[in-house]
Amino acid sequence: MFDPKLKEALGRVQKPGRYTGGEPGSVYKDKEKVDVRFAFCFPDTYEVGMSFLGEKILYELLNSHENWWCERAFMPWLDMKAEMERLGLPLYTMESKDPLTAFDAVGFTLQYELSYTNILAMLDLAGIPFYSKDRDEHWPLIVAGGPCACNAEPIADFFDVVQLGEGENQLPSICAEIEKAKKEGGVSKKELLLRIAKIPGVYIPAFYDVTYCEDGRVKAITPNELGIPARITKAIIKDLNEFAPPTNFVVPMVGAIQDRASIEVLRGCVRGCRFCQAGFLYRPMRQRDASLLNKAAQDLCANTGYEELSLSSLSTSDHGQLEELLDDLNEWAPKEHVSLSLPSLRVDNFSESLIEKTTKVRKSGLTFAAEAGTQRLRNVINKNVTWDEIEKTCTIAFNAGYTAVKLYFMMGLPTETMEDIEGIAETAQKVVDLYYSLPKRGKGKGVQVTISCACFVPKPHTPFEFVPMDTEEMLRAKQKHLLESVHSRKIKVNYHDSTTSFLEGVFAKGDRRLAPVIVEAYKRGCYFDGWEECFKYDTWMQTFADMGIDPAFYCQRAIGLDEVTPWSHMDYGVTHEYLVREYNKALAAQTTQPCNRACHGCGANHLLGGPCFDYSQNLV
């Protein structure tokens, strides 16, 4: 039975299915018989959150413990948020409909910097104080994890616990400490946090003090409790085969952004693209065995009824057993009307065999990341792709019957000139011309080449963390020049808004002094900042001004190679010396080969107890 207030709210919103729960695959337990209740919160809409594979992994993992219950909560859309505030309806979980205050721990995934005000909105709707210092042991522990945890400093004051790295061992260890403390009784919040701080990869922001130089730079980040490490090393799963992919998903009532079965085939990446934060955060690369993946995929499709299976990773075509895996999948997938998709294909190892094995049921779109329009700039960013490889790949795709290709690029990259921008248009035009030069192309069919151009945002833990971000004026000028450089109606251009990218850059490299700004901006009506129709750029800029903070200080200035950064106390395996070396190679337009061909000494090897190449010897 729904609460009468909830029933009233559901009758007044556009998509009530976002908020009802009861989806196939949901886990229900007797809350009186469980020892730990964990609310997994995704700070965006239901449709976006239900596309997130990480939630599915941890949902199944935590619920595999008989005496723990993991439930889900999402950020309500504007209409539901207004109804909940009008009716005094607190934010609740999808399974039990209990408010977040009824849980032992409330966990947020940090996937995107522009979700930070949504986190405050969810805490506000739940009636939970924003700041960790204002919550004692009677409140749920507020936990964060995910890629943005690598510099959680702008929101560190809101969280009790921040997980660095991979959560499969880490999160159950946190829940185990919560369970132990509850059974003991009388354990203070500080004592519980001291225990949790001993778990590998756990960062307790309250146990660190930050001091600043007169010019605003970070001076030092130091522990303020005995036994707390000066640097926190990320948690890592050494052998992914020890954690089989989920074989059941909660199937959404309302179509998710990515509504399909998905299995993670590998983690990490060997490529070393200098702009790619994920490629550095998840080093070294580890893969699952083809036999394990095939069994998990078959069970997942059977349990959920999905007819599309995505082989997910940062670079799926680098899996050493990919051809074998596709052969195994194609033994059963066509019979079950399941199509296969590879969302992260590489231009330089795409083959006719690969395309044949992924189009036996129906064709899905092809997207390739060229990233830059000239070879010089591709060398700068270490995107080891040439025009010959792009030409070969598109030829294979067009001969196989494809008539649409999307090419991903970035603008605002280090050392970029207008010549590089023109190169984007020239590359797209060469793809169009290639299509019409092929005798095997589909007769009577035209080609569509889409340029998707993101604004480059320098991120922590990458060789480009030192570089300033382009100003909005510079990015808009480059966007205008790109549009003027495209002359074919066969080419469509999409590009990101430079103002949202600017705010993303501010939070990506920000520090704890931004927390009050985020709170004030939320109070002034800023949330869903990643949504164009909701983003209030002027409100943000006025808030920064009123609070005496210059946002450009964080993202539009060069960081010294020996400067203490807000994330200096976070160790993701790759050494500072390696990042500096790669930065200098970038300025010289020198490339670094993938690390499955040779170890370059990035430092991530110590996380596995041996050289990286020992763990990737079968990756070719």
Regions found by a protein language model. Give the residues of each.
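A short beta-strand-loop structural module common to alpha/beta enzyme folds
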Residues: N67-D79
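Radical SAM enzyme core and accessory elements
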Residues: M1-V27, F38-F40, H487-V620
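Glycine-rich beta-alpha loop elements in corrinoid/cobalamin-binding modules
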Residues: P76-P223, P463-D511, V519-E533
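Canonical Radical SAM [4Fe-4S] cluster-binding loop centered on the CxxxCxxC motif
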Residues: F52, G255-S291, G601-L619
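N-terminal [4Fe-4S]-dependent radical SAM core
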Residues: K7-A39, Y46-E47, P205, T211, ...
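Conserved SAM/AdoMet-binding glycine-rich loop
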Residues: F40-C41, T45, L114, D299-K406, ...
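Flexible glycine/acidic-rich beta-alpha junction loops that bind and position SAM and/or redox cofactors
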Residues: L78-D79, P154, D209-C213, G320, ...
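N-terminal pre-triad scaffold of radical SAM enzymes
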Residues: F38-D44, L62, V250-Q277, C301, ...
